């Protein structure tokens, strides 16, 4: 687990809310505080879909919604002349991207052992921070996955031109 302070909040928010930078991540939850509090649970509501629609949903056993699909709604909540007083967005890597990361390391884990590889994005008092986290459904003292995920996020941000400290 690492905590990264984003150096240019405005550029980061553009990547988060306008550009496609984070579109392949899944949304676990979002809390946005403007004139009132808005909370989004990113878990997909199975009852909303017909059986046919459900069958067309792909990947990740469709437990969580893609950020791509919820991003416009979140953006609509905060656009305007005033920034939110605070915002927390929790995302996780897709199963496909998690499998790709696992294939690059020797952690002795499978995606069945992983509840999620998370990034917690927090905006408050004009600053944006990202905190990484891993959740396993088995006990392990091995921190290989944690280290690899932390490195992945640092490289991901750097490749997008998002500076941090």
Q: What is each stretch, according to the model?
A:
Residues 12, 22-25, 48, 73-75, ...:
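Phenylalanine-focused residue identity feature
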Residues 128-165:
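Mixed-charge, glycine-accented linear interaction segment located at domain edges/termini
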Residues 1-69:
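Charge-rich, low-complexity N-terminal segments
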Residues 3-6, 25, 70, 119, ...:
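Generic alpha-helix detector with strongest preference for long hydrophobic helices that associate
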Residues 59-127:
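Surface-exposed, low-hydrophobicity interaction/linker segments
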Residues 27, 31-32, 37, 96-98, ...:
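Generic "edge-of-domain/loop-turn" microfeature
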Residues 30-34, 43, 110, 138, ...:
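Short, surface-exposed, charged/polar-biased interaction segments
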């Amino acid at each position: 687990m690492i905590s990264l302070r984003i150096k240019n909040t405005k550029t980061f928010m553009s990547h988060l809310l306008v550009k496609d930078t984070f579109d392949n991540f899944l949304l676990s939850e979002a809390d946005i505080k403007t004139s009132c509090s808005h909370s989004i649970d990113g878990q997909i509501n199975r009852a909303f879909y017909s059986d046919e629609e459900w069958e067309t949903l792909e990947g990740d056993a469709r437990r969580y919604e893609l950020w791509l699909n919820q991003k416009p709604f979140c953006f609509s909540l905060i656009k305007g002349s005033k920034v939110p007083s605070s915002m927390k967005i929790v995302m996780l890597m897709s199963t496909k991207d998690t499998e790709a990361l696992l294939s690059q390391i020797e952690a002795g884990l499978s995606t069945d052992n992983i509840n999620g590889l998370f990034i917690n994005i927090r905006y408050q008092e004009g600053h944006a921070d990202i905190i990484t986290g891993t959740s396993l459904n088995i006990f392990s003292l091995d921190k290989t996955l944690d280290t690899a995920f932390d490195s992945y996020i640092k490289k991901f941000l750097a490749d997008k031109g998002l500076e941090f400290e």
